[in-house]
Amino acid sequence: MTRTRRGYIARRRRTKIRLFTSSFRGAHSRLTRTITQQKIRALVSTHRDRDRQKRDFRRLWITRINAVIHENGASYSYSRFIHDLYKRQLLLNRKILAQIAISNRNCLYMISNEIIK
């Protein structure tokens, strides 16, 4: 059986992958085999880190809220604050509360004082 020449199809596939990895360093952007491996590895990393980013930001927001609450009253904790928020049916998520804690602490103090009552 005669050997078939792939022509432009294989070249087009390789250039598509090469464009994806053009910003990588060294052989990771030049050699076809390592390019395909690095592309798969990069996509795996981005998929994993999208979930990790959600976790990290949630931890950051909780830390910021907790720090501001502890400044206001030492006996009041973050978990009690969130519990009281839900009891009062205030629809403020952690992201918004963290932004309030950074930009306008007095507003967060007012919210926590209203909840405590």
Swiss-Prot record:
Superkingdom: Eukaryota
Gene Ontology terms: biological process: ribosomal large subunit assembly; translation
Keywords carried by this UniProt record: Chloroplast, Plastid, Ribonucleoprotein, Ribosomal protein, RNA-binding, rRNA-binding
Gene Ontology MF terms: rRNA binding; structural constituent of ribosome
Pfam families listed in its UniProt record: Ribosomal_L20
Family: Belongs to the bacterial ribosomal protein bL20 family.
The protein's name: Large ribosomal subunit protein bL20c
Encoding gene (name): rpl20
